Amino acid sequence: MKPFPRAEISRYALQSNLAQLRLIAPNSKIMAVVKANGYGHGLLNVAECVGLLNYVESVCKYHGGADGFGLARLEEALQLREGGVKGKLLLLEGFFRQSDLPTLVSHNIDTVVHHESQLQMLETIALDKPVTVWIKIDTGMHRIGFSLEQFNSIYQRLLACPQVAKPIHLMTHFACADEPDNPLTQTQMNAFEQQVSGLEGDRTLANSAGTLFWPTSQADWVRPGIALYGVSPVVGDRGVNHRLIPAMELVSNLIAVREHKAGDSVGYGASWTAKKDTRLGVVAIGYGDGYPRNAPEGTPVWINGRRVPIVGRVSMDMLTVDLGADAQDNVGDSVQLWGKALAVEEVAEHIGTIAYELVTKLTPRVVVELLD
């Protein structure tokens, strides 16, 4: 028997999703965003499946592998280099310390520059060769990036800095692209174009939502994150609506099946009481594995071809489901918490969160297994 709980990662789904994103953005290069351990799918798993690993070069060419990878931390980028990735890597938050800069140079890692402190570090260091920079413009997200008023002076300082490779690349990030009717995205696109018109360098604006819903934002590069994993970035939408395939199936097993009498409660706090005689199943997964404790009663799981509801509170190692009075389920039967049969987007909606949070919060107790 395979270990459980486990996250089964589909190589085919990842490669199919990349191919579909190429059809959606045919004139753009793809920077696959693999931060947070490949959105919980395993950093090197994703890298192997969608391109750039030296030992799967022929496979990546056949499938049209990603043109680069976007990451949040230098440690993630170094893990990819150590794993054999040779292509473009970009630190989406940039570097945090001046001492990081020689490492960026020696490992050929691009960096975002979004703050005055980073520029000062570049201006006061001597490097063996210049570092490739993407200047981030704050067009409306108001999180990181140079304001529209700052941009010209910052850009000129970067041009004058010998530690910065030329041309300088240009980027912004959307605040509301996952709301297809929100006019802010078009406002951000207009502001970005006004700032960068006539400048050299590659441009990137589109995250997953931009790529799927705002085709005029696709530019030189798109940066799909959650879409690469077969999940829609838009609440109420599903990845399958865009011909994307869920890449993760979170599965476990039934470890107990119990007769349960009407009027009996179950679990901590006795928060659920059976209205009629039924059979309960106990599933070996809980908040210690990253399944949310706040999943309400009625959140579905998938067992033997049907949905059954969670009842009672999710505990650290287990959760309980109402199998029904006539259930024929047995100890050892497989349980899918989300995946192809039960969209992670739907589970997230039941819990009151987003799919991003579910897939990235799995703990090390969950075995991540790459399948063909």
From Swiss-Prot:
Lineage per the UniProt record: Bacteria, Pseudomonadati, Pseudomonadota, Gammaproteobacteria, Alteromonadales
GO-annotated molecular function: alanine racemase activity; pyridoxal phosphate binding
EC number: 5.1.1.1
One GO CC annotation: cytosol
Pathway: Amino-acid biosynthesis; D-alanine biosynthesis; D-alanine from L-alanine: step 1/1
Keywords: Isomerase, Pyridoxal phosphate
Cofactor: pyridoxal 5'-phosphate
Gene3D superfamilies xref list: Alanine racemase, Lyase, Ornithine Decarboxylase, Chain A, domain 1
Enzyme kind, highest EC tier: isomerase
Any Pfam family the entry gives: Ala_racemase_C
One example of a Gene Ontology biological process annotation: D-alanine biosynthetic process
Record field: catalytic activity: L-alanine = D-alanine
Top-level taxon in the UniProt lineage: Bacteria
Functional description taken from the UniProt entry: Catalyzes the interconversion of L-alanine and D-alanine. May also act on other amino acids.
N6-(pyridoxal phosphate)lysine PTM sites in chain numbering: K35
Protein name, per record: Alanine racemase
